[in-house]
Swiss-Prot record:
The gene is lys4. Residues 47-74 are annotated as: Disordered. The keyword Nucleotide-binding does not apply. GO terms for molecular function: 4 iron, 4 sulfur cluster binding; homoaconitate hydratase activity; metal ion binding. Residues 1-35 form a transit peptide. It is found in: Mitochondrion. Belongs to the aconitase/IPM isomerase family. Keywords: Amino-acid biosynthesis, Iron, Iron-sulfur, Lyase, Lysine biosynthesis, Metal-binding, Mitochondrion, Transit peptide. Residues 52-74 have a biased composition (Low complexity). This is Homoaconitase, mitochondrial. PROSITE patterns: ACONITASE_1. Binds 1 [4Fe-4S] cluster per subunit. Pathway: Amino-acid biosynthesis; L-lysine biosynthesis via AAA pathway; L-alpha-aminoadipate from 2-oxoglutarate: step 3/5. It is an enzyme of class 4 (lyase).
Length: 777
């Protein structure tokens, strides 16, 4: 139902509203609509609180009340993302305005760790730290492996709790729920702040106007010790919603559709800001926003930020009125909410975005993701025709197992009871697992009767926590089985056997599928007779009554997009600079190799996730030996990898390498295999942080991937020894490829690998680097 013109994805009928987008450049001063497009030749790329001294949990450094004043016109217009980062950046020069691309020293309002708290604590102690810089900044939750009652796991949990008590850190034991949900419902992730976590789904905090982004274990240890860590402000994409969702269409359908329809890495390593008219944004509840923000991770983004608006204000005031504990009430204090909305932080007029995307919500229908990929999204009505039998269904995860989700699933069964006049059960041969996002959300569902409705239908309860979503505990998919889940990630092997098939869908569709035994919906959605496709594409929609409804304002937007287009287009068409004798050479830090050379080992696949690199079943086994890590490296992607790879090989893969979870072992297992360098077409940001922090160098070389696919595409293998030689001269920033004995030799310039990153790697990673820096103090 789509057609492409240039890089604009258009519905097969005229747009209902003007779009500033592609495919041709035109300017009309008689209209508020301006069109801008890239020429075809350009490529688009129960809380246990331990305190040593009494202190308010709302006090951090910088102050949680230091939100920028949006009415004070800055010299440099900023996006909402840039404004929030500005408020939590240390050491900025006087008059400096944070912009995308800046490296900043970030002091987050909060930092959450979960089951990985103990490995983080070991890093914290290894760098020589003895005292947590700001205990109020840290939150610990146990949520991933809560069904594991082994002595080893219980001892680890005990060690985490003891550490929290010793340092006065807020601690939530196993059974209280998924850490991200706790951060939301307990008010730690507060609007207008920066909140990070050592988990890839920190993006979820954007659902409440809090800039949430993932960090990795080493970053978390650094924050514990110093209160800060480095961060590069990503390019920022504005995603504009228009219209409202039809009945039967949910937030899960929105993000599944976005991930599947914009599936060419359009927002890879971007920060996202979701916008829309007042009517549109009011139609999206906070729970809906949390679902969308949560899965911006799977879409490839580093943040997914919703506005600080009236919908959020109503939610906050409800939380303030119903907070039952003193500590929670303090975080949702009326005074704090009043201060926030007395002058809410918004993007400035004229703020520059690197990309503009849009989606008309009214044209959307229920969607299903998979199998085994979030980049494959299919309208439910198409899948229903195939009557795909399922073996397991899951209503789990921080994405979609809040009380509202449980209510939606329960309604499917209640409606079936009303239709049949008698009890209904989960289909024969289907196992339906349910785990609430938190203990508090489960209590709400129980009081409403929704939890019991699912249990009466034969659902299998699991403790509040991550459950099957992380691939741990009861109910994992077995070889050959098919499952459908309301969770966020369906990568191969993520939820059990690599030989199973996993689909993702809304709670309603999961419940209906469990009831019917095949992938199906509850029948609520009715497609309009005049529907001709999903309205989605690149560009900015100009809506009547919006702030872009004068010629002058449209001109400002046109100029901003023109600047962005010229910049990215010139990069796309200009030849890469060669490094000749007159080129500036890079200084080499002692201990860092001047040259890295080896045979190219080609893993011909895009979107290899961290689950593919290092299976989830090993992630929380903290005593896995280096030899074992090397043995299981890439196990989910290619079981034969271990026998093919050799020490010293240059690891080369496709695009969006290292997407998915923030597990550190994805990098350290490659190092354990004695592979000195990872090269890919593009690399996920969180994996990049893990790699550098653990002393694994990286390069992005799209041209090399394209050439390898030209040479070996006719006989595709998961892992191939190519016989090609790869040589990276770090000093001259030059890569030379010898395409096998007697083959072509060619060279390419690559970005300089700066001495500061060399130093971290030469020291053996960020942990050892920080330890060295502390010893200097």
């Amino acid at each position: 139902m789509f057609k492409r013109t240039g890089s604009l994805l258009l519905r097969c009928r005229a747009s209902r509203v003007p779009v500033i987008g592609r495919p041709l450049i035109s300017l009309s001063t008689s209209s508020t609509s301006l069109s801008l497009s890239r020429p075809r030749s350009f490529a688009t790329t129960s809380l246990r609180r331990y305190t040593e001294a009494s202190s308010s949990t709302t006090q951090t450094s910088p102050s949680s009340s230091s939100w920028p004043a949006p009415d004070a016109a800055p010299r440099v217009p900023q996006t909402l993302t840039e404004k929030i980062v500005q408020a939590y950046s240390l050491g900025l020069a006087e008059g400096q305005y944070v912009k995308a691309g800046d490296y900043v020293m970030l002091s987050p309002h909060r930092c959450m760790t979960h089951d990985n708290s103990w490995p983080t604590a070991l890093k914290f102690m290894a760098i020589g730290a003895s005292k947590v810089h700001n205990p109020d900044q840290i939150v610990m939750t146990l949520d991933h492996d809560v069904q594991n009652k082994s002595e080893k796991n219980l001892k680890k949990y005990e060690s985490i709790e003891k550490f929290a008590k010793q340092h006065g850190i807020d601690f939530y034991p196993a059974g209280h729920g998924v850490g991200h949900q706790i951060m939301i419902e307990e008010g730690y992730a507060f609007p207008g702040t920066v909140t990070v976590a050592s988990d890839s789904h920190s993006n979820m905090y954007g659902g409440v106007g809090c800039l949430g982004t993932p960090m990795v274990r080493t970053d978390a240890a650094t924050i514990w010790a110093t209160g800060r860590t480095w961060w590069k402000v990503p390019p920022i994409a504005k995603v504009q919603f228009t219209g409202t969702l039809p009945e039967g269409v949910t937030g899960k359908d929105v993000i599944v559709a976005l991930s599947g329809l914009f599936n060419k890495d359009e927002v890879l390593n971007y920060a996202i800001e979701f916008t829309g008219s007042e009517e549109t944004m009011k139609s999206l509840s906070v729970d809906t926003r949390l679902t969308i923000a949560n899965m911006t991770t799977e879409w490839g983004a580093l943040t997914g930020l919703f506005p600080i608006d009236s919908t959020l204000e109503q939610w906050l005031r409800h939380k303030a009125a119903t907070a039952s504990r003193t500590e929670t009430a303090r975080r949702f204090a009326e005074e704090r909410i009043n201060e926030l909305f007395a002058n809410p932080t918004v993007a400035d007029r004229g703020a520059r975005y690197a990309k503009y995307l849009y989606l008309d919500l009214s044209t959307l229908s229920p969607y299903v993701s998979g199998p085994n990929s979030v980049k494959v999204a299919t309208p439910l009505d198409e899948l229903e025709k195939h009557k795909l039998k399922i073996d397991k269904a899951y209503l789990v995860s921080c994405t979609n197992s809040r009380a509202s989700d449980i209510a939606a699933a329960a309604k499917v069964f209640k409606d079936a009871v009303a239709r049949t006049g008698g009890p209904v059960r989960v289909a024969d041969g289907v196992e339906f697992y349910v785990a609430a996002a938190s203990k508090a959300e489960q209590k709400i569902a129980e009081e409403a009767g929704d939890w019991q409705a699912l249990m009466d239908a034969g659902a299998i309860p699991l403790p509040a926590g991550c459950a099957v979503c992380i691939g741990l505990g009861a109910g994992l998919l077995k070889e050959g089985e098919v499952g459908i889940s309301a969770s966020n990630r369906n990568f191969k092997g993520r939820m059990g056997s690599p030989d199973a098939k996993a689909y993702l869908a809304s709670p309603e569709v999961v419940a209906a599928s469990a009831l019917n035994g095949v992938i199906s919906g509850p029948g609520i959605y009715k497609r309009p007779e005049d529907w001709t496709g999903v309205s989605i594409g690149e560009g900015e929609v100009v809506e009547s009554g919006s702030r872009i409804d004068t010629t002058l304002e449209a001109m400002e937007k046109f100029i901003g997009q023109l600047d962005s287009m010229i910049d990215s287009s010139s990069k796309a068409v200009m030849p890469e600079e060669s490094t000749g004798s007159g080129a500036t050479e890079v200084d080499i830090v002692p201990g860092f190799p001047e040259k890295i050379e080896g045979e190219i080992l080609f893993l011909d696949a895009d979107n290899i996730s961290t689950d593919g690199i290092y299976p989830g079943k090993y992630t929380y086994q903290d005593d896995v030996t280096k030899d074992k890590m090397a043995q299981v490296c890439m196990e989910n992607y290619d079981p034969a990898f271990s026998g093919i790879a050799r020490a010293g090989d240059i690891f080369v893969s496709g695009f969006n390498f290292g997407c998915g979870s923030s597990r550190e072992q994805a990098a350290t297992s490659i190092l354990a295999k004695q592979l000195p360098l990872v090269v890919a077409g593009s690399i996920g940001n969180t994996f990049s942080r893990n790699a550098v922090n653990n002393a694994l160098p990286l390069l992005e070389m799209p041209r090399l991937i394209e050439r390898l696919r030209e040479a070996f595409g006719s006989e595709k293998q998961p892992t191939r020894r190519t016989g090609w030689t790869f040589t990276w001269n770090v000093r001259t920033s030059q890569v030379t490829v010898q395409e096998g004995p007697g083959g072509e030799t060619w060279s390419q310039s690559v970005p300089a690998f700066p001495p500061n990153l060399q130093d971290i790697i030469a020291q053996g990673g960020l942990e050892k680097w920080v330890k060295k820096e502390i010893s200097k103090a």
